[in-house]
Design a protein with these regions (language model features):
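N-terminal Rossmann-like dinucleotide-binding module
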Residues: 1-34
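Histidine-centered divalent metal-coordination motifs
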Residues: 17, 58, 141
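Conserved acidic residues
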Residues: 28, 47, 120
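Short amphipathic alpha-helix with an adjacent loop that forms part of the alpha/beta core around
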Residues: 37-45, 113-114
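Beta-strand-loop-alpha-helix segment that lines the small-molecule cofactor/substrate pocket
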Residues: 48, 54-55, 59-103
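A contiguous active-site-proximal alpha/beta segment in oxidoreductase catalytic domains
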Residues: 79-132, 142
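Rossmann-like dinucleotide-binding domain that binds NAD(P)(H)
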Residues: 125-177
Length: 177
């Protein structure tokens, strides 16, 4: 039996998710982030809502779906704020629903591992994006890959700074030890 699912987000990742969801589920609707999705969710008795909208919209969308007692798959990052992420986890537990954050690149680490074993300095080039896009969409993958190799060192925080007319970013990873 195929599950009834809905998709909020019509951008690049929304389009990718749509093509996959139509193959494996009953995709009941695809909405932009500004549509009133409450009625669609309630009318279609959904098992899951997939969210692929801009990062700054994730918290409210996910929170509202969880409060409707619907399982949520959210494209990363879950939120742009740690405390908001903790709130969403608490809401999911309270409502006994599942909350999943896409993290597919964490499982493809053979090549990065070879690079890490050879090099002490790792450079990652990204261009044509604003600060939030850079950090939350692209650096996320770099940090996620690094985390797989550095987790035994207890990471305390990750931050970034922009330099040279906003074209170069420096990322700092601070360890507890």
């Amino acid at each position: 039996m195929r599950l009834n699912v809905g998709l909020i987000g019509k951008g690049k990742w929304g389009t990718i998710l749509k093509s996959k969801l139509t193959e494996i589920a009953n995709l009941k609707f695809v909405l932009g982030k500004n549509k009133n999705y409450f009625d669609f969710i309630l009318a279609n008795k959904l098992s899951w809502v997939f969210i692929a909208t801009p990062n700054n919209t994730h918290f409210e969308l996910v929170k509202n779906c969880l409060n409707l007692k619907v399982n949520v798959f959210c494209e990363k990052p879950l939120t742009i704020n740690y405390l908001e992420a903790k709130k969403l986890i608490k809401i999911a537990k309270k409502n006994k629903v599942k909350l999943y954050v896409s993290d597919v690149y964490s499982f493809h680490n053979k090549k990065p591992k070879k690079i890490l074993l050879k090099n002490r300095i790792i450079r990652s080039k990204k261009s044509n994006m604003n600060d939030n896009e850079f950090f939350y969409r692209f650096m996320y993958h770099d940090i996620s890959i690094l985390f797989n190799f550095l987790k035994k060192y207890n990471i305390k925080s990750v931050s970034f700074k922009k330099f040279i007319k906003k074209k170069i970013y420096k990322t700092n990873i601070q360890f507890k030890n």
